[in-house]
Amino acid sequence: MALRDERVTLAHGGGGKAMRDLIEEVFTSVFQPPGMEDQARLTEAALAEPGARLAFTTDSYVVTPVEFPGGDIGKIAVCGTVNDLAVGGARPLWLSAAFILEEGTEVALLRRIVATMAREAEAAGVRIVTGDTKVVGRGACDGVFVTTSGVGVIPPGREMAAGRVRPGDVAIVNGVLGDHGATILAARGDLALTSDIESDCAALGHLMADVIAAAPGIRAARDLTRGGLASALNEIAQTAGCGLVIEETALPLRPEVVGLCEILGLDPLYLANEGRLVVFVPEAEAAAALAAMRARPEGAGACVVGRAVAEHAGQVRMRTAFGGARIVDMLVGEQLPRIC
C-alpha cells in the first residue's frame, strides 16, 4: 500500500506496518541494493589483492538548515564519508545510512534527501548497502539527523599519513575556500544577508584517485571540513613535526566570502568546506598533481598555497600580503555551529 502520510509519525519508528511502508517507499525503493537488510553482506573480492587493507570511517550530520544552496544534509552525508575515505588513500566502496527523524518532519523533505543521497552515491561510485531509521518525539531532535559509515580499500603499498610530510613538500588545495560555511551562515536567515554563494559540497574520491595516479609520491591529504584549512594544516604540522608556511596572496577566496567574514569578524581560514581538500606532495610532483586536479570540475580552481619547512616545527605561519608574518593557530571555540 502506498505511503499516505504527509509527515513522519511515531508509528513510522515503531517496527510495524507504518515503519515498513516508510522504509520500502522512501528508502529501499531509491537505494535499491539487492536484498537490503539490517546486516550488509559484502564481497571479499575487493580484498583479493595481497596486501590490501580495509579503511573504515563514520560521521554524523546535523546541519541546519537541512537544505541549502548547493546541497542538503543527504549530499553532505554521502560526500563527507566518501571524502574521509578518499583522503586516507582508500577507494570508497560501501556506505551505511542511519536516520533519526523528528516526529512531524515532512515526508516530501525526507524523499528529497534520500534521492540526493542515491544520486551522489552513484556519482561517487559507492553503494548504500544497509541502514536504520529511528523516530523521536517533537523537540527531541531538529528535523533530520543522518549518520553514515563508509568502508573502502587501500591498495597494497599505498601509504598516506600526516607524519610522512617533509620540509620542501608543497601544499595544494583543490579550489576556493569557505564557500560552504558562508552559504550556511547566509541560508539561516538570522542576518539580513543576501548572497549568490553556494556550498562547495562534492565527493572527491575520483579526484583523489587521479591525483594519486599523477603524483604517486603523495605524502598526505586532509578534507577541510570543521575548522577549515587552518585546523587541517595545524594537525599536519604537529603530526609531521615540521613547520608549514602559507601565502596569504595565494589563498583562493571569493570576494563575497571575504566581505562576509569582515562584516562578522570571522576568519575565512577557519570556515568549513565540504568539497575541499589539501594534499602534500614532493615539489617534483606538484605540477602533475595540479594538472590532475584541474582536469576535474571539482578541482578546476586548484592552486599551491604553501609548503612545509624545517623551521618552527609544529606551527603554521602565514606570510601576509603586506610582507609580514603571523601564526595561524588551531581554531579555539566555535565560529559557526552545526555546519555539517
Swiss-Prot record:
Catalytic reaction equation(s)? C-terminal S-carboxamide-L-cysteinyl-[HypE protein] + ATP = C-terminal S-cyanate-L-cysteinyl-[HypE protein] + ADP + phosphate + H(+)
Could you name the domain of life of the organism this protein comes from?
Bacteria
Q: Which InterPro entries does UniProt cross-reference here?
A: HypE, PurM-like_C_dom, PurM-like_C_sf, PurM-like_N, PurM-like_N_sf
> Any idea which residues bear S-cyanocysteine here?
C340
Swiss-Prot/TrEMBL keywords: Lyase
Kindly list the GO molecular function terms attached to this UniProt entry: lyase activity
Q: What class of enzyme is it?
A: lyase
Record PTM: Modified by HypF, which adds a carboxamido group to the thiolate of the C-terminal cysteine, yielding a protein-S-carboxamide. The carboxamido group is then dehydrated by HypE itself to yield a protein-thiocyanate.
Q: What EC designation does it have?
A: 4.2.1.-
Identify residues that carry S-carbamoylcysteine. C340
Swiss-Prot/TrEMBL GO biological process terms: protein maturation
Q: Tell me any Pfam family this protein matches.
A: AIRS_C
* Pathway the protein acts in: Protein modification; [NiFe] hydrogenase maturation
* Keyword Lyase on entry: yes
Q: Which Gene3D superfamilies match?
A: PurM-like C-terminal domain, PurM-like, N-terminal domain
Family from the record: Belongs to the HypE family.
Return the NCBIfam families for the record. Answer: hypE
Function, in words: Involved in the maturation of [NiFe] hydrogenases. Along with HypF, it catalyzes the synthesis of the CN ligands of the active site iron of [NiFe]-hydrogenases. HypE catalyzes the ATP-dependent dehydration of the carboxamido group attached to its C-terminal cysteine to a cyano group.
Task: From the Swiss-Prot or TrEMBL record, give the protein name.
Answer: Carbamoyl dehydratase HypE
Which organism does this sequence originate in? Rhodobacter capsulatus
Gene expressing this chain: hypE
